[in-house]
Amino acid sequence: MNTKILSKDKDPMGAAILDYQKSGKAGRLRVLSSMFEEDEMPVKHLFRKVEEMPMLEQKALQLAKGRVLDIGAGSGCHTLTLQEKGLEVKAIDISPLSCEAMKLRGVKDAECINLFDEHLETGFDTILLLMNGTGIAGKIENLPTLFNRLKALLNQDGQILIDSSDLKYIYENEDGSFDINLNGAYYGEVDYQMIYKDVKGDRFDWLYVDFPLLKSIAETCGLHGELAAEGEHYDYLARFF
């Protein structure tokens, strides 16, 4: 896996987050994909308070304990909630603009660093990967590398809290059957590109994965897994330890 961070001219989400932090408003954050129609991400949603968060995120924050690593922390909404509870939290993101916004918001330890950078400190009791945490793997084949890296960052009795969704509902017919090409790429592998004002990000791979498959891959890496919570629409929170 690469260890890059984003350049500011290729960081539309970070630009939107910093705009909103500084002015209380932001333009349209457009989300493009070769698989779906163009969508828009409400930037205000990235600044949600704990009571505005989906149930799965609230559950993850309840389960967090000890020293916490928040991966892909974005605007820092999860980190700030845990800080207020008195936990020691390190927030990391590959977006320098997001990290700037987090510091302005009061995140005590925000670092612009890639998860796979060897200089990232270790020794965490809880690792959080929220807002479809499996996404950063990009492809199914990269999940073992991701899990092994997370294991290396954990303390002996630590836990990984990660959420995702099973995209099979996209292929569901009215009779309840599914039109999934079993010979093609895994159906949860998608691609996205984001645009904010004149800032155009590079296209990137993103992974949604069903829990049984995620659990089986984690087990090959020596991790035990359990379903911590299920959402209302094929989404779930998993806990690995």
Specify the residue positions occupied by each region the protein language model found.
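N-terminal auxiliary segments of SAM/dcSAM-dependent transferases
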Residues: 1-30
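SAM-dependent methyltransferase
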Residues: 7, 19, 156-213
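Conserved alpha-helix/loop element of class I SAM-dependent methyltransferases that forms part
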Residues: 43, 47-67
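Conserved SAM/SAH-binding loop
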Residues: 75
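Conserved SAM/SAH-binding beta-strand->alpha-helix loop
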Residues: 95-96
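Conserved SAM-binding strand-loop segment of SAM-dependent methyltransferases
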Residues: 106-117
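A short SAM/SAH-binding and catalytic strip from SAM-dependent methyltransferases
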Residues: 124-144
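A short glycine-rich, Lys/Arg-flanked "PGG" loop and its adjoining helix->strand segment in the class I
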Residues: 143-156
